[in-house]
């Protein structure tokens, strides 16, 4: 678990991964070298797994987004599902879930026909019994960074 200072540094980097250590230092009250040491430590411990950019999927030609519920044949391991789905560049996220489905995959496609082809290929995987999909009409909220649950959770 990150302490408050590390969390503020991570939040600053999540907002802008190109932000300088000096700029972050001004935000959190540390020198640039102190921020760098903390970032290096956070990378070494795996708290920071990389630095990236956020790109609008439509700018790359991904015009259609959907979620696919995957219902697996009995005794399918999460590792089998992961190996099956990681072959599809269109699958940008996948998780095992509670409820009737075994997993949910987020899929981007160039258009409806492309989405349909991806859905057919996923449904044809040996571990898949059936699928159910929903298409995104309008993304309402996408968060790439948030504070820790202890500080931000709305309690009763």
Tell where the protein language model's regions lie, with residue ranges:
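A compositional/biophysical signature of low hydrophobicity enriched in polar/charged and small residues
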Residues: 1-156
């Amino acid at each position: 678990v990150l302490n408050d200072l590390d969390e503020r540094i991570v939040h600053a980097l999540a907002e802008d991964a190109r932000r300088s250590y000096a700029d972050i230092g001004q935000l959190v009250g540390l020198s640039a070298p102190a921020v760098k040491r903390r970032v290096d430590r956070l990378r070494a411990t795996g708290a920071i797994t990389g630095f990236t950019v956020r790109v609008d999927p439509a700018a790359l030609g991904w015009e259609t987004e959907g979620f696919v519920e995957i219902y697996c044949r009995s005794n399918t391991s999460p590792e089998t599902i992961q190996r099956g789905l990681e072959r599809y560049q269109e699958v940008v996220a996948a998780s095992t879930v509670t409820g009737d489905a075994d997993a949910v995959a987020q899929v981007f496609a160039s258009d409806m026909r492309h989405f349909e082809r991806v859905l057919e290929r996923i449904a044809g995987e040996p571990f898949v019994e059936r699928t159910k999909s929903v298409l995104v009409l309008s993304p309402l909220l996408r968060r790439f960074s948030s504070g820790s649950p202890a500080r931000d959770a709305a309690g009763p």
